[in-house]
Amino acid sequence: MEDDFDTQNQFPEEEPEEMDMDLPDNDEADSAPYLKIGEEMEIGKSGLKKKLVKECEKWDTPENGDEVEVHYTGTLLDGTKFDSSRDRGTPFKFTLGQGHVIKGWDLGIKTMKKGENAIFTIPPELAYGETGSPPTIPPNATLQFDVELIAWRSVKDICGDGGVSKKIIVEGEKWEKPKDLDEVYVKYEARLEDGTIVGKSDGVEFTVKEGHFCPALSKAVKTMKRGEKVLLTVKPQYGFGEFGRPASDGLQAAIPPNATLQIDLELVSWKTVVEVTDDRKVIKKILKEGEGYERPNEGAIVKLKLIGKLQDGTTVFVKKGHEEDEEPFEFKIDEEQVIEGLEKAVMGMKKGEVALITISPEYAFGSSESKQELAVIPPNSTVYYEVELVSFIKEKESWDMNTQERIEAAGKKKEEGNVLFKAGKYARASKRYERGVKYIEYDSTFDEEEKKKSKDLKIACNLNDAACKLKLKDYKEAAKLSTKVLEMDSRNVKAMYRRAHAYLETADLDLAELDIKKALEIDPDNKEVKIEYKKLKEKVKEYNKKDAKFYSNMLSKMLEPHKGTQKEAQAMSIDTKA
């Protein structure tokens, strides 16, 4: 029944570590409004609203320049969730009033107290405006954020313990700041408190995480913008500690034990390094920033210039789009026309961006030898691509479609999923079904006939996706998808069958039995369900045997001490008589 298909994702949301909207300098809200729980009021004169969910007894609120730490969930007005730090399990940190986030956040969060929870309704003018933030936020969208202010601290105290103090001498540009994997280029001069120079560079490049000179440099550059110049006061624990550092061949003076340092530091530039996959096996280093904010989505047609090299850095195995009369290399995303790692990396690029992509074998050519046009790639090879994204044409988003187009797009994704499923490509098929559902997930604007078609497509896509999840051994997700179907069609035997199958695999035998019995009530002659019922009975017998053995062993162990005590008592009795 898993293969018995009804024949009637968009790119995952990026984690907005810092939301990219420039802010005006003027502030509309400088004080915290007094609210009772459940009350809502407007902040400023631009339509920003705040509703208090949980109050706090403290009175102080953060100021511009403070680093705040929040948990949040962002939704559209129709309830569609587009982002959540709570789902990721990691609070979001940013510097208040510096343009790191949309203006509605900067204005709203400065009215909050530590521990407070509030819901902000943010009009498009204070959010992402006329352009929106594709693919998750449509143009002219009013947003709602459920925000909890966890903590904040002054960015002047970088580490929170007084170990590194930062004084900004020259403000940097824009709002971006380097992260752990980025390669920064800095200039610095380090001095003892008496002015003795103990370290200097007119230009050095290093990875933030790996550091350079002393731990304070890595801590500091993560708080700096491009072009920013600062004076750091560095305590020993972030300098050279209790042992100091000896002089080096007359080139650098010694650093005494427990010395405090003064460091002039300039962040000249950096190359952004991105972990494309969660397992860090596809890494992208941006050599040249791209234009705008849009990136290719699944189904997009992209054009590239690329050079592929082996790990030795000299062996070129592919080169496309670089000759004067040569057209860029073209492929369609999610059609297996290139290796998985390259495809994933390109989906995170902007038009005109140039990047160096490092791809481990799992996302490249695997454990087999692969003959490419210019060289043979040995088994288990890590490969490197230098890629320029020349242009791309995105697949149409759902909000750019009318209702009929959305239904047709959903049907097309379902058919594509069916083809992939029959070819045994279950993960890719699952993505097609998920994308199909997204087109028609919200159908409030559909007429009655369109709603019926939409419902049938949602049932088919979720049902077939559940079959994919069973094949991929993702049994919990298979059960969830089957439940979605049953919420729309409570007598759907296939959904009961697939959920029962999932429950059997997760050892939820009581739940599996309920689904199987219900399915047989509706369709007593269904062979597949009968086979599943047989499997259930066998599993129940197996578990009963295990339980019987377990309790038998446990009972034996409980009785053993009593037997031993009895024997000892008998022995003592004999000894006494003797």
Swiss-Prot record:
Ranges occupied by TPR repeats: 410-443, 459-492, 493-526
Its EC number(s): 5.2.1.8
Tissues/organs with expression: Expressed in the whole plant.
Catalytic activity: [protein]-peptidylproline (omega=180) = [protein]-peptidylproline (omega=0)
Enzyme class: isomerase
Modified-residue entries (N-acetylmethionine), positions: M1
Subcellular location: Cytoplasm; Nucleus
GO MF terms, alphabetically ordered: calmodulin binding; peptidyl-prolyl cis-trans isomerase activity
Biological-process GO terms, alphabetical: cellular heat acclimation
Domain PPIase FKBP-type: from-to ranges: 65-153, 181-271, 299-393
Induction data: By heat shock and by intracellular acid stress. Up-regulated by HSFA2 and upon pathogen infection.
Gene ablation phenotype (knockout): Acid sensitivity and increased susceptibility to P.syringae infection.
Region (Calmodulin-binding): 539-555
Biased composition (Acidic residues): 1-30
Top-rank taxon, per record: Eukaryota
Cellular compartments per GO CC: nucleus; plant-type vacuole; plastid
PANTHER family in the cross-refs: PEPTIDYLPROLYL ISOMERASE
Protein family per UniProt: Belongs to the FKBP-type PPIase family.
Entry function: PPIases accelerate the folding of proteins. It catalyzes the cis-trans isomerization of proline imidic peptide bonds in oligopeptides. Co-chaperone that negatively modulates thermotolerance by interacting with FKBP62 and decreasing the HSFA2-mediated accumulation of chaperones of the small-HSPs family. Plays a positive role in tolerance to intracellular acid stress by maintaining the pH homeostasis. May be a part of transcription regulation pathways upon pathogen infection.
Record note on quaternary structure: This PPIase probably binds calmodulin. Forms heterodimers with FKBP62/ROF1.
Protein name: Peptidyl-prolyl cis-trans isomerase FKBP65
